[in-house]
């Protein structure tokens, strides 16, 4: 049997000249800006032009390009090795389909079709489902892929045991390496969303809460923990509390902070710049006595094991379903399970 596992992620510019087209692709997505195309495209052009210089400065901190693709390639190779170990009779290959920069779904679709798989598993590198991330990628893939193979989607895995274990290990290692500082708050920081997206039935916030609770349950030494949301932009009300507000609150209370990127499985601009530079500087200004940041799971063995289990476990079904103990409550009407994987 030939198995293609298609890993979805955001993508990132591979050089300064790619920043504007990357931003344009992002903001022309109707899942991000819900306007008709006749209005959305000019607005995307305006936003990408006005934000280009600031974004280029952020990527310059990381060497002028996003590390997301090489990080994802390392995860793909680790997943292939784990699949070969667990299922030696399966010829499994992991492919990468980025949403907003290369390799885009059209390019990856050609590669998958040339591989001619019997089975396809669509596996997002977003543990928590949102219509703005996984939902958008699944729709994009459906438009791009017309090749062979029976397909199904792992829509989410927010509280899968291996994911929680990977985060918990990295948090504990970060704390121990720093000398086990006392009076420290564990802050799970996730990418934010406009509140209206969640109010419309998107399950993302509930799944972030489930992820954080699963990790915290493995870390009894951290009795003080919370959740915050980063990357807020524009005038709309966003999920809260905001990470910058929580940094200021910790400073006012004299608390140290250990920040874990609970919604991210790879290092990229939101971890390496926003958390490591912007919020670290804010913590210093705000009087936070200790500011630590745990790494994203990357190729940590429990996380790669989760991806392998999710892929192999999906082979006996069709459609979209979560991996692990998660099940969306009925209030989340835009979850993937109720909408063919896309919402």
Swiss-Prot record:
GO terms for molecular function: ferrochelatase activity; metal ion binding. Its main location: cytoplasm. Pathway: Porphyrin-containing compound metabolism; protoheme biosynthesis; protoheme from protoporphyrin-IX: step 1/1. CDD domains: Ferrochelatase_C, Ferrochelatase_N. Disulfide bonds: none annotated. SUPFAM superfamilies: Chelatase. The keyword Cytoplasm applies. InterPro entries: Ferrochelatase, Ferrochelatase_AS, Ferrochelatase_C, Ferrochelatase_N. The keyword Iron applies. Its EC number is 4.98.1.1. It is found in: Cytoplasm. Fe cation binds at residues 191, 270. GO terms for biological process: heme biosynthetic process. One of its GO terms (cellular component) is cytoplasm. Keywords: Cytoplasm, Heme biosynthesis, Iron, Lyase, Metal-binding, Porphyrin biosynthesis. It catalyses: heme b + 2 H(+) = protoporphyrin IX + Fe(2+). Catalyzes the ferrous insertion into protoporphyrin IX. Belongs to the ferrochelatase family. This is Ferrochelatase.
């Amino acid at each position: 049997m030939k198995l293609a596992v298609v890993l979805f992620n955001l993508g990132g510019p591979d050089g300064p000249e790619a920043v504007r087209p990357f931003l344009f692709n992002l903001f022309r997505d109707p899942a991000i800006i819900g306007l008709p195309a006749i209005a959305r495209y000019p607005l995307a052009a305006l936003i990408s032009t006005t934000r280009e210089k600031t974004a280029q400065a952020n990527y310059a901190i990381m060497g002028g390009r996003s590390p997301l693709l090489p990080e994802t390639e390392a995860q793909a190779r680790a997943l292939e090795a784990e699949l070969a170990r667990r299922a030696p009779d399966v010829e499994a290959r992991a492919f990468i389909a980025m949403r907003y920069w290369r390799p885009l779904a059209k390019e990856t679709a050609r590669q998958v079709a040339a591989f001619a798989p019997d089975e396809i598993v669509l596996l997002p590198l977003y543990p928590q489902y949102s219509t703005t991330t996984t939902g958008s990628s699944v729709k994009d893939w459906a438009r791009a892929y017309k090749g062979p193979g029976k397909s199904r989607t792992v829509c989410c895995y927010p509280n899968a045991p291996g994911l929680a274990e990977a985060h918990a290990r990295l948090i504990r290692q970060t704390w121990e390496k720093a000398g086990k500082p006392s009076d420290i708050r564990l802050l799970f920081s996730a990418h934010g969303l406009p509140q209206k997206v969640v109010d419309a039935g998107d399950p993302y916030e509930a799944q972030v809460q489930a992820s954080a609770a699963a990790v915290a349950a493995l870390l009894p030494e951290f009795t003080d923990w919370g959740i915050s949301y980063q990357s807020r932009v524009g005038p709309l009300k966003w999920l809260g509390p905001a990470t910058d507000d929580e940094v200021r609150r910790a400073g006012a209370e004299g608390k140290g902070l250990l920040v874990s990127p609970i919604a991210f499985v790879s290092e990229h601009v939101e971890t390496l710049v926003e958390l490591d530079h912007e919020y670290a500087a804010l913590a210093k200004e705000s009087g936070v006595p200790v500011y630590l940041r745990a790494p994203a799971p990357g190729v940590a063995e429990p996380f790669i094991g989760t991806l392998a289990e999710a892929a192999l476990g999906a082979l006996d079904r069709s459609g979209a379903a979560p991996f692990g103990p998660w099940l969306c409550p009925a209030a989340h009407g835009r979850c993937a399970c109720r909408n063919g994987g896309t919402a």
